[in-house]
Amino acid sequence: MFKSMAIAAFSLSSLLVAPLASANWQVNNEQSKVSFVSIKKNSIAEAHHFKKLSGGLNEQGQLKLMIDLTSVETLIPIRNERMTKLLFETHEFPNAILTADLSKTLATLKSGQHVLKGLKAELDFHGNKKELTIDVLANMSPKGDVTVSSLTPVIINASDFKVTEGISELQKLAGLPSIATAVPVTFSLTLDKEK
């Protein structure tokens, strides 16, 4: 479906929003969502999502999102089971972990203000890590909660994470002529400011 990056030094202008530096935020699972689309038979697209997300954003602007792969929801129980066992292999890789440096975003984010960034991130999925560049929309509510959403889908290629064999297994079991190995992923995260 994220090589640690050095924390960017705040510019002089970031001192104007220095109070943010003392905050921590936690992912609100109920108000957050990570979704992906699978395409079978070349043209049949189906949307799926994960029901359990956790993680947070610390005062240095480092984001960590943990996706519980056992919580995949495709609306078909047998497909959920096959994905967890054959594709994700959750007995060995129960989570996908996305890390990103939001320090520059936090430095310029004010209450109610939206900031678009080409965010550098790293996805750790199925024992493999890959750097990603994500376009995001960020917002801070008047009470200090932060939302971070994908502006465009993030394309995850199965070959980058060595899950093409799992896709082939799913294809055989379902009797399908094809399942796409490039998957668009979208996300919307709400991070509650700690009291």
Question: Where is each model-derived feature located?
Answer:
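Bacterial N-terminal signal peptides that target proteins for export
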Residues: 1-9
